[in-house]
Structures are given as structure tokens and as C-alpha cells.
Swiss-Prot record:
SUPFAM superfamilies: Class II aaRS and biotin synthetases, tRNA-binding arm
Gene, per the UniProt record: serS
Identification of the protein by name: Serine--tRNA ligase
EC annotation from Swiss-Prot or TrEMBL: 6.1.1.11
Species per Swiss-Prot/TrEMBL record: Acidovorax ebreus (strain TPSY) (Diaphorobacter sp. (strain TPSY))
Top EC group: ligase
GO MF annotation: an example: ATP binding
Free-text domain note: Consists of two distinct domains, a catalytic core and a N-terminal extension that is involved in tRNA binding.
Amino acid sequence: MLDILLLRKDLASAVARLETRKKPQAFLNVEAFQALESERKTIQMRTEELQSQRNQLSKQIGMLMGKGEKDAAEAAKAQVAAIKAELDGSATRLDQIQGELQSMLAAVPNLPHESVPVGSDESANVEVRRWSPDGPQPRSLGFTPKDHVDLGEPLGLDFDMGVKLSGSRFTVMKGGIARLHRALAQFMLDVQTQEHGYTECYVPYVVNADSLKGTGQLPKFEGDLFAAQKGGQDAEPVPDNAQLYLIPTSEVPLTNFVRDEVLAEAQLPLKLTAHTPCFRSEAGSYGRDTRGMIRQHQFDKVEMVQIVHPDKSYEALEEMTRHAEAVLQKLGLPYRVMSLCTGDMGFGAAKTYDLEVWLPAQNTYREISSVSNCEAFQARRLQARFKNAQGKNELVHTLNGSGLAVGRTLVAVLENYQNEDGSVTIPEVLRPYMGGQATLPV
């Protein structure tokens, strides 16, 4: 959530920065905001005036009673009672206004950082760098590559069974390919915990509405979530804040560790990681990536989260991007790093880098990780703070990133390590997790 003081100080500048984001969405009803702000100021000025009058009358009452002027004192008491009634009404209306302003701000995305390229969609994203084990460009396989579906089905990918069990955009894995998927997740966790200093966490896969509000998925993106309905004899209607949802990413529970907390400055940075399934309805993606594992309702991901001092968040963004890159480099997978433009960034991000891995069968790069600095946007919603050197509570900055998406990494391994006979060579770094196995045979 944006700092309302920033909007009060320079609304025009904030709106101009918001206008660079994805259109035609209206992020802030400026007229409604200004009307509420005007009413708030009027009420606050009137409140201060009434409080001053009440204080003066209270003093007069004591003086009048001391002089024995009982009738005048009673008249002053009546005035105080009338002022109290008006103050109570003003306080109620002020609470309503503050609630309306908070609801309005909850739908407004983060302001893009000044270093973010301006553009309306992904065509304006800027390539930062690329890497390949064989030079700047991905190597040719020397034969016409198969995509991961044609490769994977003989090896244990079963899309028909996924449809049978759950519907479209679900996948079943069996045998060696299921083990390779598990090996990738274990390898990613080991890299992030043993080499990059993250603390591994096991988290619930179901969270409450307050957790999703804190990280920005609610209320704006409820349509992208899977709600969980509690069953059994105690399945009673629940209030909105007690509604449960399947996690769309472990960013949600990990970042909420610090909700309503005040950390010591010495505790920063907090570096957390978790391997979880993620559940997304993929609303609005009808007809996109319907073949294979690229866009699923359920997929696994190793997530990285950092909670940092505000002065360190852009250093942390670069560091986390390198942490995600390290996994791809160890796997020998060609990739490029893209700086997302203002129109392509997520709701809570001030700046985002996407890592895109090379897929030979598509002859293109596809997103495999997204690393974002949310600055204080989530922390303000979460009331996540630390005690600074001056002893004052200050909002932390939060960052999150994939380290990596496991299913898409499996896709990249299958396509980049395929052999002409349809078998797949297992990357050397994964072989210890595969019992020394070097190949997935057809």
C-alpha cells in the first residue's frame, strides 16, 4: 500500500507515475480521493475548533460554580454536551472516511522505481544480460528438437491422467521424471540454503485472508486464487477475514512471518526460502499455453524472500537475482535477464527482473523466475517494522523471487538436454539426487 502522506504531498506526481503502468485500468479515482481528503480536512479543522471551545467552556463551568452562578454553569454544561455529540458524530464520519481511503489505496499498485523502463507491455522490457555455457548464444542441438510434451510423455509425464483427476492444466508425473522433478527442488533448496544463506522453512499451503491482504493479492486479485471450503460438522459460515485460500506462492506465508512485528535492526536481513506447491486459477489466461506444463493451476516453486533495511533493498534485489541465476548456471541452462517495464510489472513491485530460460523447441526464452523489490509497499499493509538506530519504528522493505519455478525448470532441462533418440541426459549437478543416474532412457 502506498503512503497516503505521499499522495497528500504530491498527488499529481504520484498519479503521473501510476499512469505509466498497465492500461486501461484506472488505479486511483482522483476526484473521489480529493473529495474524501477535502471532507477529512474540514472535519479535522472543525474537530480542533470544537475541542478548543469545549476546553474553554469546561474552565468557565468551574469558575461559574465557584461564583455560585448555577444557572450559567448549567447552560455551559449543555453547550459542552452538544459539542460532545457533534464530536462523536465527527469521529464516526472520520472513521468512515479513513476506511474509504484505505479501501481506495488497497486497489492502487506500487509506484515504479525511477530506474524502471517506461512502457505499456512486455515489448518494452529491456534485456540486461544473457548467459550460456557455450558463449553468448544457446548452442544448436544439431537436430530438430522436440518440445517437452513429446519428450516427456514417454518418460512419465501424463497430461491425460491430470485431466481425469482434476481437469485441464494439471499434470501427473511418474517414474524417472517424477524423481527428476523432486531432484530439481532439492537441488534448488540446497543452493539457496547452503550457498546463499537462506533459512529453509516449511509453511502451510493454506492461508487466511489477512495474509493475502498483507502481500497484496487481496482484495484486488481474488479471482486468481483458489478458496478453500472447510468441511465436517463444524463447517459454519466464516467472516471474510477468516476465509482460507490455497497459496499462490510461498511468498505469502514467508513474508507474513513479519506481519505486526517489530524487529531489531540487527535481525536484518531475514533470508527465507521454501519449496511448496502453488495454486493459481490463471484467470484471464484462456487459450494461452494450453499445451504442456508452462501454465498450470498447480506447480512447484522454490521461493526466496528477503526482509531488509530500506537502505539495502536495491542491493538485495541485485543479490537475489544473482541467486536465481546461480541455479540456472549450475544446471547449464541458457538464460537472459530482463528488466520489466512499468506496464509489465506486478501489482506490488517497485522494480522487477525476470529470468527467461531458453527453450529450443519454441526457439525462444520463457520466464522461469521473477525477482521483485516491493520496497515498503507490502510492509505498510503488514505493519512490518524494525527499530532503527534512533530508536524509532520504521517500515522494512520486502523482496521476493523464484529460485526457481520447478516445473518450468524441468521443461528447460528436458528440452536443452534431450538427445536425438528421445532420451534425456541428466545434468551432472542433479546426478547425486538421482542415485548417480546419468540418463532418462526412453
